[in-house]
């Protein structure tokens, strides 16, 4: 008797599966289409043997080329390591690698554009074309405006930390390639408020992604919806059929071990053509201001990403000094 396919195998038939990790061995084992990185994942990768040569090479570069401005040297080594990890991952996945622009640039459009262009150039120098990468940017108004320009230059962007409809619609109107709504962090907020959902279909993170997905499809938007920040396999299963789902290795392993039918929950089949109403900075700001959850989680997410980047840089500074 043939064993039934795992839920992970079934999910791959419904959605593009993305690995939310820089763990080289986990990606080899789980075979996602895309993967995504951030400073925390890069910092963890520094402890993995597969990256040992990369780390030593870039630290040696830092020691050789570092001038009097130690901070600039550390920051450059951090960028080189980030791209180096991305290059290794690009060898493994058939699709894209998302690479995050510094979170402390989240409210600076021009600096975000400059950093994105730098990352694309660094990848190109290492033999990775821009069609293999996504530039990950926090979905502030300034970040979305940066993505609008980058998309015009053929640089595809992943707008992250999406918690609110205004953010999602502004990204779609700007022609952003992909957005990452954060399912788990939305749930976390409401659970902390004592509002635990009675069922997965009432999970506010799941409801938000379903709403955005359906509205995008109804409006004929080409912007990809990639659910992110999952707390359980139940949340993932509730979004089966979403364009893409970025999932941590532990939840991918659980899905690979589970069997039973995994029905499609989202489908563009009933989509109707419609047009987006342009969102300006004032309507964007008012939409966020009216949503305490999104306001808190966007600011908190940027702060967490910035702290993670500073932690990566501190680790590099310590290694350079050692």
Swiss-Prot record:
Cystine residue pairs: none
Annotated metabolic or biological route of this protein: Carbohydrate degradation; pentose phosphate pathway; D-glyceraldehyde 3-phosphate and beta-D-fructose 6-phosphate from D-ribose 5-phosphate and D-xylulose 5-phosphate (non-oxidative stage): step 2/3
Top-rank lineage group of the source organism: Bacteria
EC number: 2.2.1.2
Entry's Gene Ontology molecular function annotations: transaldolase activity
Keyword flag Transferase: yes
Pfam families with a match to the protein in the record: TAL_FSA (PF00923)
InterPro entries tied to this protein: Aldolase_TIM, TAL/FSA, Transaldolase_1, Transaldolase_AS
Gene Ontology cellular component annotations, sorted alphabetically: cytosol
Cellular location(s): Cytoplasm
CDD domains: Transaldolase_TalAB (cd00957)
Active site: 136 (schiff-base intermediate with substrate)
Signal peptide span: none
Keyword Transferase: yes
HAMAP family: Transaldolase_1
Function: Transaldolase is important for the balance of metabolites in the pentose-phosphate pathway.
Assembly and interaction partners: Homodimer.
Name of the protein in its database record: Transaldolase
Annotated source species: Xanthomonas euvesicatoria pv. vesicatoria (strain 85-10)
């Amino acid at each position: 008797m043939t064993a039934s396919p795992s839920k992970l195998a079934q999910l791959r038939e419904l959605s593009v599966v993305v690995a939310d990790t820089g763990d080289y061995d986990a990606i080899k084992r789980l075979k996602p289409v895309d993967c995504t990185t951030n400073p925390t994942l890069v910092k963890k990768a520094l402890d993995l043997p597969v990256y040992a040569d990369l780390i030593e090479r870039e630290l040696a570069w830092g020691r050789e080329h570092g001038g009097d401005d130690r901070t600039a040297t550390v920051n450059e080594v951090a960028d080189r390591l980030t791209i180096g990890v991305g290059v290794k991952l690009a060898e493994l996945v058939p699709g894209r690698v998302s690479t995050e622009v510094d979170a402390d640039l989240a409210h600076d459009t021009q600096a975000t554009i400059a950093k994105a262009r730098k990352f694309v150039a660094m990848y190109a120098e290492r033999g990775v074309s821009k069609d293999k990468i996504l530039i990950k940017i926090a979905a502030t108004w300034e970040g979305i405006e940066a993505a609008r320009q980058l998309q015009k230059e053929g640089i595809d962007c992943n707008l992250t930390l999406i918690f609110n409809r205004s953010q999602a619609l502004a990204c779609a109107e700007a022609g952003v390639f992909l957005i990452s709504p954060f399912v788990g962090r939305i749930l976390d907020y409401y659970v902390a408020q004592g509002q635990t959902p009675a069922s997965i279909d009432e999970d506010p993170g799941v409801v938000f992604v379903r709403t955005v997905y359906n509205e995008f499809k109804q409006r004929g938007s080409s912007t990809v919806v990639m659910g992110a920040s999952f707390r359980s396999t139940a949340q993932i299963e509730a979004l089966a059929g979403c364009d893409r789902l970025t999932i941590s290795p532990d939840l991918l392993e659980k899905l690979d071990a589970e069997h039973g039918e995994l029905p499609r929950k989202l489908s563009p089949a009933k989509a109707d053509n419609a047009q987006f109403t342009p969102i300006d900075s004032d309507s964007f700001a008012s939409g966020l201001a009216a949503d305490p959850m999104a306001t808190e989680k966007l600011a908190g997410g940027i702060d967490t990403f910035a702290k993670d980047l500073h932690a990566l840089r501190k680790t590099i500074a310590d290694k350079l000094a050692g």
